[in-house]
From Swiss-Prot:
The gene is groES. GO terms for molecular function: ATP binding; metal ion binding; protein folding chaperone; protein-folding chaperone binding; unfolded protein binding. SMART domains: Cpn10 (SM00883). Keywords: Chaperone, Cytoplasm. It comes from Legionella jeonii. It is found in: Cytoplasm. Its main location: cytoplasm. One of its GO terms (biological process) is chaperone cofactor-dependent protein refolding. GO terms for cellular component: cytoplasm. Heptamer of 7 subunits arranged in a ring. Interacts with the chaperonin GroEL. It comes from the Bacteria. Together with the chaperonin GroEL, plays an essential role in assisting protein folding. The GroEL-GroES system forms a nano-cage that allows encapsulation of the non-native substrate proteins and provides a physical environment optimized to promote and accelerate protein folding. GroES binds to the apical surface of the GroEL ring, thereby capping the opening of the GroEL channel. This is Co-chaperonin GroES. PROSITE patterns: CHAPERONINS_CPN10. Belongs to the GroES chaperonin family.
Length: 96
């Protein structure tokens, strides 16, 4: 099963954060917060402007992005935990 977002929404799969500190101390799952970066796996058609035009996305599928702690809505599709959010909720793209 796939999810196809509508309009100016994107679907993001969270990327796991490092769970070991510089001193090789392993941080348990219960002490970590959900990561605030992820990979875009699907995008909608674009934002519909007031004049009816559609503005294309700045981001693309495959981009690794940063987003806010409370951004979007968490959904579970085909056993994967995903986040559906508006493009405006994305703070930046991590360049490789």
């Amino acid at each position: 099963m796939k999810i196809r977002p509508l309009h100016d929404r994107v679907v993001v799969r969270r990327l796991e954060e490092e769970r070991t500190t510089a001193g090789w101390i392993v941080i348990p799952d219960s002490a970590t917060e959900k990561p605030m970066r992820g990979e875009i796996i699907a995008i909608g058609a674009g934002k519909i402007l007031d004049n009816g035009d559609v503005r294309a996305f700045v981001v693309k599928v495959g981009d690794v992005v940063l987003f806010g702690k409370y951004s979007g809505t968490e959904v579970k599709v085909a056993g994967q935990e995903l986040v559906v959010m508006r493009e405006d909720d994305i703070m930046g793209v991590i360049e490789k």
